[in-house]
């Protein structure tokens, strides 16, 4: 588990995947985005830190076929981001049930899965 601040979602995913010896497969269409942020990213209006974050980890990310604005959003240097949790597949149902019971299920999304380590730590999928 980590909080998404400073390094953007992809930066934190790279750190977690590297430390765990795995590859994260993220589905860009399953990630929630603020609509205004999407529009700004499509216009190229992103924080300068986005480019620094991209430079840090772009070599670890397979983004083939993914539109550029998604990358800008995923490298965005959040200062008040959410939490990223990696949970064993067999524990996912229990976790989702417990989150729902506690009233925080509306802010929960499954955005990908973990695969054996490959040449890239992150694989972005549509």
Q: Which residues does each predicted region cover?
A:
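Glycine-/charge-enriched secondary-structure boundary and capping motifs
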Residues: 1-126
């Amino acid at each position: 588990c980590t909080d998404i601040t400073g390094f953007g979602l992809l930066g934190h995913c790279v750190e977690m995947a590297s430390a765990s010896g795995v590859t994260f497969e993220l589905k860009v269409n399953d990630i929630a985005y603020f609509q205004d942020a999407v529009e700004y990213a499509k216009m190229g209006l992103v924080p300068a830190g986005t480019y620094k974050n991209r430079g840090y980890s772009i070599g670890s990310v397979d983004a083939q076929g993914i539109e550029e604005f998604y990358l800008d959003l995923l490298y965005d240097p959040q200062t008040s981001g959410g939490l990223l949790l990696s949970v064993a597949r067999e524990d996912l149902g229990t976790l989702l049930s417990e989150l729902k019971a506690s009233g925080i299920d509306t802010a929960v999304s499954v955005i990908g899965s973990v695969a054996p380590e490959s040449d890239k730590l992150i694989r972005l999928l549509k």
